[in-house]
Swiss-Prot record:
Induction: In roots, strongly inhibited by 2,4-dichlorophenoxyacetic acid (2,4-D), abscisic acid (ABA) and benzyladenine (BA) treatment or by potassium starvation.
Paired cysteines (S-S): none
The name this protein goes by in its record: Potassium channel SKOR
Notes on the domains: The segment S4 is probably the voltage-sensor and is characterized by a series of positively charged amino acids. The pore-forming region H5 is enclosed by the transmembrane segments S5 and S6 in the Shaker-type (1P/6TM) and contains the GYGD signature motif which seems to be involved in potassium selectivity.
């Protein structure tokens, strides 16, 4: 692999390869290797969050952070000023972790300078306690950031709040105030818990790839060893101070004599000498070398020495094991040698050529030297990050593919993140004519040929595929065998997409699937191979539209509004019908889904569309007792529009379905509709003796005097039935209807039923979006009364006339048909 002028990827010398760069790229067909190297200390500086040289808008100040706290805002743990604060507290935690054992062992009451420093440290930790109540945290189960104040406080109170608060207590002052009781000094050891902050810091450093791992681990192990021996040294000295001065000879340090130097009256010796001697005792005891110059004297010292040495056995195993794992890494070289030996045996057994041998060995050596393989690097990376990598690498190529011209960015992104990169040498056949295709390919670099095999077996070059072309799409989309053989002419870099992944994406992005098929058809004039397959593509388009209509109806039937919206946004036509002529509005109305009905109305569907059985959505809603849905449809101008309404209504009455009849009458069906025998629904109700249904029909202005084919009226049918209540009802209705007409008229006309109309205050030419909401009214006896009522209901006192949908002025109510849309206007 060649390097660029800017420098290549650098590695450590020796058997081990350790990449020192923060970012690097390896690119065969790109511009080379790009590398950006800065100061060797920059990664550590960035890790500590101490790079404050930002722009003017994002400049860090602690004052700004304190202002955020004062306003009650929640601080993100990655906030730059909070990171700086954690580094500040880390320094205090490191100081406190080492000074606390020292204070416990060597001091009984701090001198003034150390006392002031101790108080300053405790104040800093108190501020940190308050700040912790304002810092968001990541939930361990959901991995979401929690910003709720009560949750943050409750979590902290349940965890380390008590320990942190007790650690901040001024135990030196309390010790003196309590009469220098030794038991109080033991509470000082609570501050040792602060060492967990240092441990967490090392954990973060180990996970930061910008900082050398070997260096981090060695520093951590040295810290562990020093801290353990430091603490043990302080405890050894503390045990010696627990005996009175008169018994100093019974302590390890009071009885100690090194050469001519005696440690009698050791309390008067300077602090540095005492600490160094204690540290020496702790280190040699931990190392178990046992020189014998310092040893335990009294029983308490012996017991602690035994416990300490037992602990040192575990600590020593931990330190040695970690150091061995860090230093001994010959296994990597051994794995490379074993793998190379296996490859050589394989190549010899299969007698591979020199060219392919060189490629294989070169690839393995590159893997070893660079510690890089694409699959190994990406397999542990989250899918979202792998998707971003794929978009960076492949999106520029896929956007130029003519097959995806006009497709949505979301669809293209889904294609990109599922691509696999492959390379092919000249002469290789990728697809054979007549084979079943399971992959879709896109050309990034190189040249391929589409070859057709004629009847006599000769080859004919049909097309030349260059960068930004695709192949395999016709076989996949139309579900036919591969029409041509695809062979590599020049070294090619190709992106592969599995058929199943492609079809899964198309099921979600329907509109883009149709766009792809249209792109194929649009290119048929310039592409002979596609022109020959035009009928297959057209058939597939029709099949796709039928499947989409079924999916829309299925979503409407099951009340899945989200799926319905997704399908319509993806290009589904809500006016398309299934094999029975039923639209999504039919199914939503029949199931009583108000939300879906309202959404479909907003999508400007035809509210009066009929299925193959002649049913409208309004009729479906009424059949199933969905009155609220029916009201929505009526408000939008929906009508029953039933063919052979008389026969239909007579059938309903014959079944005795009073609820259904009531809903039909309230939604504008003509109660005087007649069947093939000129019988009205009232004829059927009277003949069957349905008193309740007869009342409903009479109240809906059914004509009592209407005659059937044989000249019988409903009253005649009731007399034949013999139902006295029904006879009286019809006689009263007859007298009422006769009296409501002039004396010269013997019978009222047929169809003296009420008519409804929908009145809008807008111009008939306005679109549905601009039209104001109208009102449904019964048609009164005069046009003046209709205008007056509409003006009052719509609150437009200036209106003076009514227009039809054709912008014609209506001057008589007899000209208004049932369910007609009218427009209230100002006459000029």
């Amino acid at each position: 692999m060649g390097g660029s002028s800017g420098g290549g990827v650098s590695y450590r010398s020796g058997g081990e390869s350790d990449v020192e760069l923060e970012d690097y790229e390896v690119d065969d067909f790109r511009d080379g290797i790009v590398e950006s190297r800065g100061n060797r200390f920059n990664p550590l500086t960035n890790f500590l969050g101490l790079d404050f040289a930002g722009g003017s808008g994002g400049k860090f100040t602690v004052i700004n952070g304190i202002r955020d706290i004062s306003r009650g805002s929640i601080v993100h743990p990655d906030n730059r000023w909070y990171k700086a604060w954690t580094m500040f507290i880390l320094i205090w935690a490191l100081y406190s972790s080492f000074f606390t054992p020292l204070e416990f062992g060597f001091f009984r009451g701090l001198p003034e300078n150390l006392f002031i420093l101790d108080i300053a440290g405790q104040i800093a930790f108190l501020v940190d306690i308050v700040l912790t109540f304002f810092v968001a945290y990541r939930d361990s189960r959901t991995y979401r950031m929690i910003y709720k104040r009560s949750s943050i406080a409750l979590r902290y109170l349940k965890s380390t709040f008590i320990i942190d608060l007790l650690a901040c207590m001024p135990w030196d002052i309390i010790y003196k105030a309590a009469g220098e009781k030794e038991e109080v000094r033991y509470l000082l050891l609570i501050r040792l818990y602060r060492v967990h902050r240092v441990i967490l810091f090392f954990h973060k450093m180990e996970k930061d790839i910008r900082i050398n791992y070997l260096f981090t681990r060695i520093v951590k192990l040295i810290f562990v060893e020093l801290y353990c021996t430091h603490t043990a040294a302080c405890i050894f000295y503390y045990l010696a101070t627990t005996l009175p001065a008169s018994q100093e000879g019974y302590t390890w340090i009071g009885s100690l004599k090194l050469g001519d130097y005696s440690y009698s009256k050791f309390r008067e010796i300077d602090l540095w000498t005492r600490y160094t001697t204690s540290m020496y005792f702790a280190v040699v005891t931990m190392a178990t070398v046992g020189y014998g110059d310092i040893h335990a004297v009294n029983m308490r010292e012996m017991i602690f020495a035994m416990v300490y040495i037992s602990f040192d056995m575990i600590l020593g195993a931990y330190l040695i094991g970690n150091m061995t794992a860090l230093i001994v890494k010959g296994s990597k070289t051994e794995r490379f040698r074993d793998k190379m030996a296996d490859i050589m045996r394989y190549m010899n057994r299969n007698k591979l050529g020199r060219n392919i041998r060189g490629q294989i060995t070169g690839h393995l050596r590159l893997q070893y030297e660079s510690s890089y393989t694409e699959a190994a690097v990406l397999q542990d990376i989250p899918v979202s990050i792998r998707a971003k990598i794929a978009q960076t690498l492949y999106l520029p190529y896929i956007e130029k593919v003519p097959l995806f011209r006009g497709c949505s960015s979301e669809f293209i992104n889904q294609i990109v993140i599922r691509l696999h990169e492959e390379f092919f040498l000249p002469g290789e056949v990728i697809m054979e004519q007549g084979s079943v295709v399971d992959q879709l390919y896109f050309v990034c670099h190189g040249v391929l040929e589409e070859i057709g095999i004629t009847k006599d077996g000769s080859e004919e070059i049909v097309a030349v595929l260059q960068p930004d072309h695709s192949f395999g799409e016709i076989s996949i989309l139309c579900n036919i065998p591969q029409p041509y053989t695809v062979r590599v002419a020049e070294l090619c870099r190709i992106l592969r997409l599995d058929k199943q992944s492609f079809m899964n994406i198309l099921e979600i992005f329907f509109h883009d699937g149709r766009r792809i098929l249209n792109n194929l058809l649009e290119g048929k004039e310039s592409n002979v191979r596609i022109k020959q397959l035009e009928s297959d593509i057209t058939f597939h388009i029709s099949k796709q539209e039928a499947e989409l209509a079924l999916k829309l109806n299925s979503a409407a039937f099951y009340g899945d509004l989200y799926q319905l919206k997704s399908l319509i946004r993806a290009g589904g036509d809500p006016n398309k019908t299934d094999y029975d002529g039923r639209s999504p509005l039919h199914l939503a109305a029949s199931r009583g889904y108000e939300d879906i009905t309202l959404y479909l109305i907003q999508e400007s569907v035809d509210v009066n569309i009929k299925d193959k059985l002649g049913s409208t959505p309004l009729l479906e809603a009424i059949k199933n007792g969905n009155d609220r849905v029916a009201a929505l449809l009526v408000k939008e101008g929906a009508t029953l529009n039933i063919e052979n309404a008389g026969t239909f209504l007579c059938t309903v009455v014959a079944k005795g379905d009073s609820d259904f009849l009531k809903r039909l009458l309230s939604n504008g069906i003509d109660p005087n509709s007649k069947d093939y025998d000129h019988r009205t629904p009232l004829h059927v109700a009277a003949s069957e003796g349905f008193y309740v249904l007869a009342i409903q029909l009479v109240e809906a202005s059914a004509n009592v005097l209407a005659k059937d084919r044989w000249g019988n009226t409903p009253l005649d049918e009731a007399l034949g039935c013999g139902n006295k209540m029904l006879i009286k009802l019809l006689e009263d209705a007859k007298n009422s209807q006769i009296s409501s007409f002039p004396s010269g008229s013997k019978e009222p006309k047929d169809k003296v039923y009420k008519k409804k109309c929908t009145v809008y205050f807008s111009h008939p030419g306005d679109s549905k979006e601009k039209r104001r909401r109208g009102i449904v009214l019964w048609v009164p006896r005069s046009i003046e009364e209709l205008i007056r009522t509409a003006k009052e209901q719509l609150n437009v006192p200036e209106a003076s006339c009514v227009l039809s949908e054709d912008e014609a002025k209506i001057i008589d109510v007899d000209l208004i048909s049932d369910g007609q849309k009218l427009y209230l206007a100002v006459e000029t």
